[in-house]
Amino acid sequence: MIIGIGSDLIDIRRVEKSIERFGERFTHRCFTEIERARSDKRANRAASYAKRFAAKEACSKALGTGIAQGVFWKDMGVVNLRSGKPTMLLSGGAALILESLLPAGHRPAIHLTITDDYPLAQAFVIIEALPESL
């Protein structure tokens, strides 16, 4: 059962300007350690950060909160499954909101797709409730 859908489109140049202006203050405020480690290794660093920023926005929309109601930027992080497929790892307020959305006897599955084509980055999130028996 689908419990939330969110999408976001961001201009990579906006993220480039934030990195230039605020540097680590920006990246440490909005991104997890895992996200920073991955993005800082990329040739297209700003595009990598922009995709992750869009994923956080899309995820917050799928949760139905936006970046509010106790949900903070670093409560949502892009991680990769063993297969390489991206997903979201939630903690703090985001994890609490997700838990409150799940029907009894269900576990969450967060589906994420991210892409970029300069100057745009896009993310799409679907949050699904799966029976715990599956």
Curated annotation (Swiss-Prot):
InterPro entries: 4-PPantetheinyl_Trfase_dom, 4-PPantetheinyl_Trfase_dom_sf, ACPS, Ppantetheine-prot_Trfase_dom
One family name in Pfam for this protein: ACPS
GO molecular function: holo-[acyl-carrier-protein] synthase activity; magnesium ion binding
Compartments, as annotated in UniProt: Cytoplasm
GO (cellular component) term, any one: cytoplasm
Binding site for Mg(2+): D8, E57
Coiled-coil intervals, chain numbering: none
Catalytic activity line of the entry: apo-[ACP] + CoA = holo-[ACP] + adenosine 3',5'-bisphosphate + H(+)
GO biological process entries: fatty acid biosynthetic process
Transferase in keyword set: yes
EC number: 2.7.8.7
Keywords recorded for this protein, A-Z: Cytoplasm, Fatty acid biosynthesis, Fatty acid metabolism, Lipid biosynthesis, Lipid metabolism, Magnesium, Metal-binding, Transferase
Cofactors named for this entry: Mg(2+)
Domain of life: Bacteria
NCBIfam families according to UniProt: acpS, pantethn_trn
Alphabetical list of HAMAP family matching this protein: AcpS (MF_00101)
Function: Transfers the 4'-phosphopantetheine moiety from coenzyme A to a Ser of acyl-carrier-protein.
Recorded family membership: Belongs to the P-Pant transferase superfamily. AcpS family.
Protein name according to UniProt: Holo-[acyl-carrier-protein] synthase
Species: Rhizobium johnstonii (strain DSM 114642 / LMG 32736 / 3841)
Top-level taxonomy: Bacteria, Pseudomonadati, Pseudomonadota, Alphaproteobacteria, Hyphomicrobiales
